[in-house]
Structures are given as structure tokens and as C-alpha cells.
Amino acid sequence: MSETDFEYMFFLGCIAPNRYPGIESATYKALDKLGIQLHPFEQASCCPAPGVFGSFDLMTWLTIAARNIVMAEQADLDILTICNGCYGSLFEANHILQDNENARNKVNEVLSKHGLEYTGKSRVRHLTEVLYFDYGTEKIAERVERPLDINVAVHYGCHYLKPTDVKHIESSEVPKSLDGLVEAIGAKSIYYKDKNMCCGAGGGVRARNPEVALEMAETKVKNIIAAGGDCVTEVCPFCHLQFDRGQIEMKETFGREYKLPVIHYAQLLGMAMGMTPKEVALDLHFIPADPLLEKLGINME
């Protein structure tokens, strides 16, 4: 694929623009440097979260998701997401509607009242999937201006690779894509205990039982620190929130303090391509990235 083939409707989701706008801006800036063109959704809604909407009414979830997908269809583009939850919701809704004519007809009956029709011609893609499998780590490495000589703990999250009956991207037990992307920018992807464990944010756990959610996140943070990780990188703003804001909540709830920097891959990529930490908004995180920047010899500005 040539770089001219990389053009997408960019689905932001809710958490990035509302809680971590730096992830949004870093994605635009970093992908622009790679020659990947992103078009903003003009009237996107929540993806919506299937664990919330779908648990109450499956057709409502499918219809809202379909409306988002239709906007990409109208632009004749695929969707790119930077959030595992948005990816999971839109991908799975797309899969159901493509394969289930009855569901598709019911959804289109509602959409037709607004002059819309779902056809199923647009794909839903994840940032990690596109960068690793389509764009390629060799091309990314060629764009690196500042190799990041740090130990990075990769967190894949749950909804990027699961459920495996509909997502056939790579092994959900031994994934390699995000590790490869980290290595492409000069960093070392380290192994740590329970690497594939959930961060605790999803499935309604953070909302319903926050202490259990924090215990899950704390387990991962402790394992990463024990393995010598300089930071944790993820590809989901909700996971990012769980690790970043979560460390503040761990101190408030358990009285235990951690200072593990949390950085979305788009932010790491941007820094490796010469952007300052402030340009990728590391200064807006709850957990300061100072120890990481000191190791890299980079100033915030």
C-alpha cells in the first residue's frame, strides 16, 4: 500500500476529546508526519458503549453505531479509532449488521427516517492494526528522528483483539503488534507478569466496583515497575484513564503511591518523530512524565 491509500474518518470517541485531548492532537500530528490523512467526524455520537446500551437494548446500540458508520460510508472511507472500546463497539456492530439481514433491515427502518441507510461498505480499523499490519514498522522506523531508548511496558487491553470469534487480527494470547510498534521507535518492549490482564476499567467494573477496578490496575502497575518499566503505553484512552488517574485514586483509596508514567502510543510516536513532550500534551497527565523525560534527556518544552 502507498501512503496515498491511508485516508480515514477519525473516530475520536468520548474520553480522548473530553479527558485527554492531547491523545487526539498527538494522533493528528503524528499520523500527518507519516502521511496518513484523517478526516474528523462532523456529527459523531458515542460509539456507543455496548456494555451500557447493548445490555439494555441491542437494537438501540446497533442503530446508534450504524449511524456513525454511515457517516464514513457517505465519505467513502473506512473508520480509524484510537480507542479499544470504540473499536470493539463499531467493529462488532458492523459485523452483526453485515451478516444479519433482519437486524440490518430493522436498523435501516429507523435510519431511513433521517435520510440515512447503512450498507456495510466501510471497515472499522484500529490505530495499532493499521500502523503495524498495513503501514509497517520499517516505514515508521524510517521516520524516527529521536529513538526512544526506554523500557516500555505494552498494555493491549481487551477489546482490540477480543472477541476472537469475530476479530482475527492476531493471537489474543501472544500478540505482537503493539510490541513491534514500540520497538520501531527505538524503545524496548519489556515482558512483565500478567501482561494480557485487563486494566480493570471495562465491563462496568470501574463504575460498579471502583475498588476492584483499582486493585486490578494496581496489580499491573506493580508488575510493570517490578519488571523495570519506564512507562506503560496503551492504545485506548479508557485504559489510559484507568492507569493515569487510577494511580491518584490508588493513593487516595489505598494510601499507596505510584509514579508510573502513562503514555498513549500516538504520544510516544510523536515524540520519536521529533515533537516535544508538550506538543503531545504529556504535561496534561495526572502522573508526571519527568523521570521518563530525564532518562531521555528531553525537556518538556
Curated annotation (Swiss-Prot):
It catalyses: coenzyme B + coenzyme M + 2 reduced [2Fe-2S]-[ferredoxin] + 2 H(+) = coenzyme M-coenzyme B heterodisulfide + 2 H2 + 2 oxidized [2Fe-2S]-[ferredoxin]; coenzyme B + coenzyme M + 2 reduced [2Fe-2S]-[ferredoxin] + 2 CO2 = coenzyme M-coenzyme B heterodisulfide + 2 formate + 2 oxidized [2Fe-2S]-[ferredoxin]. Pfam families: CCG. Part of a complex that catalyzes the reversible reduction of CoM-S-S-CoB to the thiol-coenzymes H-S-CoM (coenzyme M) and H-S-CoB (coenzyme B). It comes from the Archaea. InterPro entries: CoB/CoM_hetero-S_Rdtase_bsu (IPR017678), Cys_rich_dom (IPR004017), HdrB/HdrD_reductase (IPR051278). Pathway: Cofactor metabolism; coenzyme M-coenzyme B heterodisulfide reduction; coenzyme B and coenzyme M from coenzyme M-coenzyme B heterodisulfide: step 1/1. One of its GO terms (molecular function) is CoB--CoM heterodisulfide reductase activity. Its EC number is 1.8.98.5, 1.8.98.6. Transmembrane segments: none annotated. The heterodisulfide reductase is composed of three subunits; HdrA, HdrB and HdrC. B1 and B2 subunits are interchangeable, as are the C1 and C2 subunits. The heterodisulfide reductase forms a supercomplex with formylmethanofuran dehydrogenase (Fwd), F(420)-non-reducing hydrogenase (Vhu) and formate dehydrogenase (Fdh). Belongs to the HdrB family. The keyword Oxidoreductase applies. This is H(2)/formate:CoB-CoM heterodisulfide,ferredoxin reductase subunit B1. Gene3D superfamilies: 1.20.1050.140, 3.40.50.11810. Keywords: Methanogenesis, Oxidoreductase. It comes from Methanococcus maripaludis (strain DSM 14266 / JCM 13030 / NBRC 101832 / S2 / LL).
